[in-house]
């Protein structure tokens, strides 16, 4: 009890300690649609959050990984932003204090009723464009509409939260009946089983994941029901009560040149028509997918058995493959829920201890849907025969199906799960 009380006191002291972060941006002003590089320096943190807001809404944000108290990342400014000042706020999850600065954004291509800018031409040929304000450029806590809440400290990596609808089809499920998970879609296993903080809020402690990744959020009950789940924004959305008017001294040729560069940048970052999308591959695209070699530094173990289905194209469904080709997997029913069990060659079946079943990293809730899936779309079946623990879940083995694309090639969508592309913190080298 003493240890627990001491831990709580220590956490409170950390949350109340002084938070100081220096913020640097790579430019004194920005065009809507440009990339804004943000550099943060602070102490005692692994993850920092940078968000850009006007008085109405969150405009953009980024999660920054810190190495030695320093980190740099990029905020892609939407091309539709109105002209005016925005407030750039930087904070950590476990501290109520926030560092802020004003950022000038101009949009010469689109006028908006929200514009709060005075355009002043620069006549001196040696002077570059610059921003100014009559009201001053400092912001205090009193200028903000809301105070930042204090949350749990991120000690290992980025924390994700999600809301689970625990009342479904007339049945109410409690926290101990719900298994929330987040998984990265791809050819390697990045699976995180979460914890229910209460009956509706799930929390996930992720680590080792960086950059833009396709992921799947799911919440399954002990009876195999897939509950609706939705990610909670990682940003606090700290809105200012008011912002000063932007006085922008502009040099026409400089703004025009930057505008052309911005438009080229927007074309470069726009998703290509052939960019892989979850579950939307055509057959030809699926066949063209080049599988990545398994990386044992990711999961920590290589599969005990690997089946390459290039050698067995005669099977039409996964069920046929498991029956005729893979001898160490069996379908069982546990409390009316279909499950798959895995055994080693020299072991008997453990009928009541199911395996973790994944397809392209996504947990399979409906096993029968998987068994009816087109086996010709599967490239590898990887089988891990040991006991594995994910969060509060314990599994006897892992059965991992890898499609040729690694992007859930035409796999029937699991009901109520959330598919999205998420920006994890970029890896910053020391």
State each model region's role.
Residues 320-357, 390-391, 396-406:
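Extracytoplasmic beta-strand/coil segments of soluble accessory domains associated
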Residues 49-53, 179-181, 356-358:
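Beta-strand signatures of extracellular beta-sandwich domains
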Residues 39, 65, 70-78, 85-87:
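Ligand-binding face of N-terminal immunoglobulin V-set domains in extracellular IgSF glycoproteins
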Residues 56-64, 97, 187-193, 364-366:
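Surface-exposed loop/edge segments in extracytoplasmic proteins
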Residues 340-384, 414:
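Periplasmic plug
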